[in-house]
Amino acid sequence: IFDNNSRGSIQKIKNFKKKIKFIKGDIRNKQSLNKALKNTDAVIHLAYVNGTKYFYSKPVLVLDIAIKGILNVIEGCIKNKIKELYLASSSEVYQTPNKIPTDENEPLKIPNIFNPRYSYGGGKILTELMGVHYGKKYFKKLIIFRPHNVYGPNMGSEHVIPQFINRFKSLKGKNFKIQGSGNEIRSFIYIKDFLSAFNLIL
C-alpha cells in the first residue's frame, strides 16, 4: 500500500499489517512512487481526494492529485514493466444520467466546467481516458471499475450515510429537510460486497 494517510490511518488496517507492506508517500511524488513500484506485478490505483465538500473547497487539489496521480502511475508502470493496471473511477463520471439504472454505455460528461463540484468527476473522466489509450499501447490488462458510494466500518463521519445519521439524531423528532421529492434513489455498496465484486475482476 502506497498512501500519504491524508484522510486515512494505518491503524484502520492494523489487523492486516502482517499481510501487507505499507509505504508512506504522495502519489504526486514521481520518485517515491517509482521506488514503491519496483518488483510489482500489478497496480490498483485508488488514490484520490474524496468527499463532496473538498470538490467545492479544494478543486485545484482534487485535479492536481487526479492528473499528476494518473500520469505518475502510468509512467511508473511503464518504467517498471508492470503490465496490469486497475483504475478506480466513479459514478460521478455520469453526473445526471439519462436513465436509471445506468449502464456503462451512458455518456460521460461534465455539465459545467466552471462549477468546482465537477473537479472530481472531470478528473475521473481524464483518468479513464488516459487509462484506455495508454492501456492499448503499454498494458496487457487494464480494467476500469466505477464503484458507487462504498460504505462500511471506520469510514469516518464526513460521508453521506454517517452525515445523515448524525443529522437525524440531532433533530430530536423534528422534520428532516431534504432536497427533491423524497423519491430520488442513489446506489450504495457495502465494503465487503465491493471487495467480493473486485476480487472477480482480478
Locate predicted features.
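Terminal helix-turn-helix DNA-binding modules in bacterial transcription factors
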Residues: 168
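Flexible, nucleotide-binding loop/lid elements of kinase catalytic cores
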Residues: 174-176
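N-terminal Rossmann-like NAD(P)+-binding domain of SDR-like oxidoreductases, especially those catalyzing
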Residues: 1-150, 172, 192, 198-202
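A conserved structural motif in NAD(P)-dependent oxidoreductases
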Residues: 186-193
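Short, solvent-exposed loop/turn segments at secondary-structure boundaries
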Residues: 57-58, 154-158
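Catalytic Tyr-x(3-8)-Lys segment
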Residues: 180-184
